[in-house]
């Protein structure tokens, strides 16, 4: 199988062909996802909660991300692999570059960082040095203490305009992908249509170019609170491989996420 690249996703956007992505943290699941046709995976700092058992993503280190990135890469050698730079790993452009180099050496194709216009210099520095960047706007879990919890972002004209401005600034700085998390569908549509780069949604309705889910949410094995945007595909299929195929099919057809998974 040919490796999936940024250009592959750009073509999906141009052809209006939705694509499914998922988080992965180990060899076995990465291989299973790749075998079933998921070509884009994220080693997310969500592993702090789903794998390590913390109550937020804040304790995750660059070494943690690099360890899991290497495992996922071995399981899915041809996937487009994104890796999060965790909390306080990109406070300055120089720090971002050093830490990005670590996760790229571990096997990532691209790093994901959370934040808006304040990251422009960092995004420029990374892309100029051959480190592709995926932005992340809306609900950015590393900022949970600023937001006062996990809440929908971008409601109201002023907040929506600010997020759109941030998205355009990140794209202009060189970001090649954008994740939009927990924003109203109407705003997600505005941003997706305004950007030339592909937009991946999670809790942003079915109007984005792609979707991502935390694998534990997709299989209903998350303890405690289940996000509104999550869907347990394993409950409907009774088989992990079938669940992955159904997730992909529903994303590609626009069935998932439905109205019940979306915010306004």
UniProtKB/Swiss-Prot annotation:
<dbReference type="InterPro" id="IPR015813">
    <property type="entry name" value="Pyrv/PenolPyrv_kinase-like_dom"/>
</dbReference>
<keyword id="KW-0460">Magnesium</keyword>
<comment type="subunit">
    <text>Homodecamer; pentamer of dimers.</text>
</comment>
<keyword id="KW-0566">Pantothenate biosynthesis</keyword>
<feature type="binding site">
    <location>
        <position position="114"/>
    </location>
    <ligand>
        <name>Mg(2+)</name>
    </ligand>
</feature>
<keyword id="KW-0479">Metal-binding</keyword>
<keyword id="KW-0808">Transferase</keyword>
<feature type="binding site">
    <location>
        <begin position="45"/>
        <end position="46"/>
    </location>
    <ligand>
        <name>3-methyl-2-oxobutanoate</name>
    </ligand>
</feature>
<feature type="active site" description="Proton acceptor">
    <location>
        <position position="181"/>
    </location>
</feature>
<protein>
    <recommendedName>
        <fullName>3-methyl-2-oxobutanoate hydroxymethyltransferase</fullName>
        <ecNumber>2.1.2.11</ecNumber>
    </recommendedName>
</protein>
<feature type="binding site">
    <location>
        <position position="84"/>
    </location>
    <ligand>
        <name>3-methyl-2-oxobutanoate</name>
    </ligand>
</feature>
<dbReference type="InterPro" id="IPR003700">
    <property type="entry name" value="Pantoate_hydroxy_MeTrfase"/>
</dbReference>
<comment type="similarity">
    <text>Belongs to the PanB family.</text>
</comment>
<dbReference type="GO" id="GO:0003864">
    <property type="term" value="F:3-methyl-2-oxobutanoate hydroxymethyltransferase activity"/>
</dbReference>
<feature type="binding site">
    <location>
        <position position="45"/>
    </location>
    <ligand>
        <name>Mg(2+)</name>
    </ligand>
</feature>
<dbReference type="Pfam" id="PF02548">
    <property type="entry name" value="Pantoate_transf"/>
</dbReference>
<dbReference type="GO" id="GO:0005737">
    <property type="term" value="C:cytoplasm"/>
</dbReference>
<dbReference type="GO" id="GO:0015940">
    <property type="term" value="P:pantothenate biosynthetic process"/>
</dbReference>
<dbReference type="InterPro" id="IPR040442">
    <property type="entry name" value="Pyrv_kinase-like_dom_sf"/>
</dbReference>
<keyword id="KW-0963">Cytoplasm</keyword>
<feature type="binding site">
    <location>
        <position position="112"/>
    </location>
    <ligand>
        <name>3-methyl-2-oxobutanoate</name>
    </ligand>
</feature>
<comment type="function">
    <text>Catalyzes the reversible reaction in which hydroxymethyl group from 5,10-methylenetetrahydrofolate is transferred onto alpha-ketoisovalerate to form ketopantoate.</text>
</comment>
<dbReference type="GO" id="GO:0000287">
    <property type="term" value="F:magnesium ion binding"/>
</dbReference>
<comment type="pathway">
    <text>Cofactor biosynthesis; (R)-pantothenate biosynthesis; (R)-pantoate from 3-methyl-2-oxobutanoate: step 1/2.</text>
</comment>
<feature type="binding site">
    <location>
        <position position="84"/>
    </location>
    <ligand>
        <name>Mg(2+)</name>
    </ligand>
</feature>
